[in-house]
Amino acid sequence: VNPKDFKKTMEVLEKIGKVDHHLVHEHHGMAWVDGVTVEPHYKVHNYQSPPTDYAMQEMFASVFPSELSSADMDGYAVPVFPPTFESVFLISHMVNHVYEEGLGLRQVIDYAMFLSSCADKIDWLQHHEYLHLMHMERAWRIFTCICVDYLGMSLPSQVESFSHQEKVWAEKMMADIMRVGNFGRGEYVFHHHGFKDAFNNYCWVAKRCWNLGFVCPSEARWWIISKVKRFFWKKSFKK
């Protein structure tokens, strides 16, 4: 959604469904229409490191809408991003989950399915350039290693074999996925009812950034800084 149209979009959704105005995130709102969750994005995604965030917004602008293709799903034409961008976006989305609410196995499976189907369609030189700009080369290697070593995906011919250190990182990340899971449901669930909840939420994020900083060091560092604003400053502002 174009940022200038976001308010109007939410008004339309409120007429045909339910909108939770307290769940407006840093890049999207939340609504439910006929039992289906709808996330109107006014920004493709939000990253904590300013250079990483800038790189993604520039990459997104370069492919949307001019580079979209169309895929048929049950007779409906669905817009699809170029495979190169899609791969990098999936990786970056997983990184976000790692440092906040937890990464789910289903998200890694999504990437394994995507890579199994689209590896030959990716422009790998551009892919590496995108990852470099996002500071996410290591995260990509770790997630791809999990796909190969734990999910049984064949190593794409375009991807180099993994080092011992990468396998160690993948094992640690996989252990966290199995223990914590998507949105932290296996270990911790965010609550938003006062300062104590804000403090507990922040401690959870800071601990994850410390323990899993190896996945994407630049984002881990910035999460610790930026979430002070999200969990405390906004809470004080509302009061």
Whereabouts are the PLM-identified features?
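Conserved NTP-donor binding/palm subdomain of two-metal-ion nucleotidyltransferases/polymerases, i.e.
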Residues: N2-K239
